[in-house]
From Swiss-Prot:
Keyword Ligase: no
Pfam families: Wzy_C
Gene source species: Rickettsia felis (strain ATCC VR-1525 / URRWXCal2)
UniProt entry tagged with the keyword Transmembrane helix: yes
An example Gene Ontology CC term for this record: membrane
Family according to the record: Belongs to the O-antigen ligase family.
Keywords recorded for this protein, A-Z: Membrane, Transmembrane, Transmembrane helix
Taxonomic superkingdom: Bacteria
Name the record gives this protein: Putative polysaccharide ligase RF_0568
Phylogenetic placement of the source organism: Bacteria, Pseudomonadati, Pseudomonadota, Alphaproteobacteria, Rickettsiales
Length: 407
């Protein structure tokens, strides 16, 4: 079991670089292995055959469920309940309910695993993670310099954008490696890793990952320098900015802004049109929204299609490419308030960490993930949720046990 866990810790970031969607499968397998490990350890404490094992399994599940309810009744459970309720009035209730089940089973599994017994032989697992990250970096440069040598083995063509998911995964996973190096006294190596990943992201096609990782670096420094006021500063900034974003998106003139500042960035220009369109849709159902995971089912008339520089763009291709707008569009103001309550809660938990480096790296990773979600990806995409859970589990079971922290 230990060998398989070590192999997966190496494989997830490295394979994820060239096949980003694989994270959904590899992280799920990783979580299931840890979950089964927890069950086996619990059952080993019990004597007897099948009945004892059965009783142990049921007892473990009951304990995890009770702990889950006790810890989340004020925030997570309320948000989950509202997501479920919104499925009932969604544009396609069955599809929304199916997505809801997938998402929250994965989240529950991740929560359960993250509260299990820490990894054994953590030095080996830490080395596997760092080696996996370095392999991911190497694979990126191979693909970048050879115009997709590995990708073209399986696909007819290659575009640098095909590595965007891998870059996003690398950007958030690197913070785990950075805190591992810092906690081992290897500050120079941690700085070198940050600079290397930052350079990689700067030449990649993933602007969201580059912005998230670079701002994460600034956050790391600020969290170390102004610890007494940093929590209030970051909490007020994030929550206020998130509340104002739908208002700002409605007020902007995407065509004027695109022609002035984004003439050579069609992808960024398209996002401005998407955000403006979504903000206008939000005003039609501001309180309840359109229902969980309903973005891709909202009908668009031909008159609403965007004509820009001879190209015809869809104003809402699958999702809003912004987590705050997607939450508000699908779950309404009620969902947005509950979501921001979760954001505040997690920031508060990070602030309770006593280790300066661990606290700063946790802030950086959280902001990195948040910023990527504000520019790219569907908030309910399984591979993206899996990426966040993957980092959470590593932080709690691989990094935290070797650092004295609170919460």
């Amino acid at each position: 079991m230990q060998y398989l866990i070590s192999s997966l810790i190496f494989l997830i970031p490295s394979l994820g670089m060239v096949a980003g969607l694989s994270v959904a499968a590899t992280v799920t397998i990783f979580l299931l292995m840890l979950f089964l490990r927890g069950i086996n350890r619990h059952c080993e404490r019990l004597k007897g055959a099948w009945q004892s094992h059965k009783a142990g399994l049921l007892r473990l599940l009951r304990q995890n469920l009770q702990f889950f309810l006790a810890m989340t009744i004020k925030t997570e459970l309320l948000f989950t309940a509202w997501c479920f309720i919104s499925c009932l009035f969604a544009i396609r209730p069955i599809n929304s309910l199916a997505t809801f089940i997938q998402v929250f089973i994965l989240l529950f599994l991740g929560f359960t695993v993250s509260n299990c017994v820490p990894f054994g032989n953590r030095v080996q697992l830490k080395n596997s993670l760092i080696l996996g990250i370095l392999t991911a970096i190497l694979l990126f440069f191979i693909e970048y310099s050879s115009h997709g040598f590995l990708t073209r083995t399986f696909k007819a063509s290659f575009g640098l954008y095909m590595l965007d998911r891998g870059c996003a995964l690398l950007s958030i996973t690197s913070w785990v490696a950075i805190i591992i190096l810092l906690s081992s006294g290897k500050r120079r190596h941690a700085l070198m890793l940050y600079i290397l990943v930052l350079y990689l992201l700067s030449i990649s096609d993933s602007l969201a990952s580059f912005l998230g990782f670079s701002i994460g670096g600034v956050i790391f420094i600020l969290a170390r320098l102004i610890k007494p006021i940093f929590f209030k500063l970051i909490a007020i900034s994030l929550i206020t900015g998130s509340l104002l974003f739908p208002v700002i998106a409605k007020q902007i003139e995407p065509r004027d802004l695109s022609e002035k500042y984004l003439a050579t960035q069609p992808s960024a220009a398209h996002r401005l049109f998407i955000w403006h369109f979504v903000a206008n849709k939000i005003t039609l159902k501001p309180i309840l929204g359109y229902g969980f995971a309903s973005s891709k089912y909202i009908k668009v008339n031909n008159s609403e299609m965007i004509n820009y520089n001879g190209e015809k763009w869809h104003p809402l291709p699958l999702h809003p490419h912004n987590n705050i707008l997607q939450i508000t569009l699908e779950l309404g103001i009620i969902g947005l308030i509950l979501f921001l309550c979760l954001v505040y809660k997690y920031l508060k938990q990070i602030n309770n960490i006593k280790s300066s480096n661990f606290r700063a790296a946790s802030y950086s990773c959280f902001i990195n993930y948040y910023i990527i979600g504000m520019i790219s990806y569907n908030i309910w995409q399984i591979w993206w949720i899996s990426s966040g859970i993957w980092v959470l589990v590593l932080m709690k079971l691989l990094v935290k046990p070797d650092i004295v922290v609170d919460n």
